[in-house]
Amino acid sequence: MSLEERRKKDSKESSSEEKNKALNLVLGQIERNFGRGSIMRLGDASRMKVETISTGALTLDLALGGGYPKGRVVEVYGPESSGKTTLTLHAIAEVQKNGGIAAFVDAEHALDPVYAASLGVDVENLLVSQPDTGEMALEIVDQLIRSTAVDLVVVDSVAALTPRAEIEGEMGDHVIGSQARLMSQAMRKITGNIGKSGCTVIFLNQLRLKIGVTYGNPETTTGGNALKFYASVRLDIRRIQTLKRGTEEYGIRAKVKVAKNKVAPPFRIAEFDILFGKGISTTGCLLDLAEETNIIIRRGAWYSYEGENIGQGRDNTIIWLDQNLEIKNKVESIVKTKLTEGTEVSSNSMKALNNNPENDVIANNIKKIA
């Protein structure tokens, strides 16, 4: 090596050392001024690995890449009687099963504790608030998040978060944009705290029709655009079928489209049954995925497992699986193993898992569910 080359190398090394010293100095100063964890290297941040909360429906967990992401904002919207509240009550039950604490901000004043208990919610330990104004509701949400003791907060619903000015005014007064301003301010305030605390916040929202829309979708959600931007996951839930036995209606078939997902591939679709008084049919979700992964075979109306017929018709097969828990648990274990390995699911209940690197995240989260 020539003398000139050695000088250049020494110059680069000394320059690199000076940069590292300057960087460590400024990082230390930032942490002293703003607290530990205010700035970090991405590779050192274990909290950047997104954990999930199960939705209670295996097909939807798969569509979301494991479930609702922890420490994020989630929006669930859809028409009336489509299963929005049921979906969140199942999430609350899942959190409580794992020893977590959940809160339900009932702005609509319509929570049914008997129905919640039938879905597996521990109503004795569920935190419930029925606020008078939108400001009060969002302030309660913010304080629950800041406490770092709550794992899940559900707000039902954004449309019912009425600004104080509107409540104190006369009926018929126009308070234009007040709810949108309220939501925009709230999202700016709570989003950072949500990420630090690891609390998941689910906002339920209603649909409205935009006036004068000739082309395109006239539907929109209430509360302005802030929630759409701040939400990491947005779920569009619809009722696509009413389930009947003869003339008796006993449930609905729901379809959920993942309209936005920042932590897994978006635009996946999941379907599942919601039974009146019982909630999401977990066995129905299992049967759908078992059929699509060829663990349970359907020929005509008959379903068979390992070459033996187990039921005629979907309803009878679900009943048979519920009565034979050992086989049901075995089928569930095989299904989760196949999905972890990336087996394609190609029918209506879940769009296919493509062979791409993003699905490694999904596989890891499904392992946690299993």
Swiss-Prot record:
CDD domains per UniProt: RecA
A GO cellular component annotation here is: cytosol
Q: What Pfam families does its record include? A: RecA, RecA_C
Q: Does the keyword DNA-binding apply?
A: yes
Question: Biological process GO terms, please?
Answer: DNA recombination; DNA repair; SOS response
**Keyword ATP-binding attributed:** yes
Q: Which InterPro entries does this entry report, sorted A to Z?
A: AAA+_ATPase, DNA_recomb/repair_RecA, DNA_recomb/repair_RecA_CS, P-loop_NTPase, RecA-like_C, RecA-like_N, RecA_ATP-bd, RecA_C_sf
* Annotated compartments: Cytoplasm
Residue span of region Disordered: 1-20
Highest taxon, organism lineage = Bacteria
Q: What is its main location?
A: cytoplasm
Q: Which of this chain's residues are annotated to bind ATP?
A: 78-85
Q: Which keywords annotate this record? A: ATP-binding, Cytoplasm, DNA damage, DNA recombination, DNA repair, DNA-binding, Nucleotide-binding, SOS response
Molecular function (GO) terms for this protein are: ATP binding; ATP hydrolysis activity; ATP-dependent DNA damage sensor activity; damaged DNA binding; single-stranded DNA binding
Q: Which family does it belong to?
A: Belongs to the RecA family.
* Described purpose of this protein according to its UniProt entry: Can catalyze the hydrolysis of ATP in the presence of single-stranded DNA, the ATP-dependent uptake of single-stranded DNA by duplex DNA, and the ATP-dependent hybridization of homologous single-stranded DNAs. It interacts with LexA causing its activation and leading to its autocatalytic cleavage.
UniProt-listed HAMAP family? RecA
Q: Give the protein name, as stated in the record.
A: Protein RecA
Protein source organism? Prochlorococcus marinus subsp. pastoris (strain CCMP1986 / NIES-2087 / MED4)
Tell me the name of the encoding gene: recA
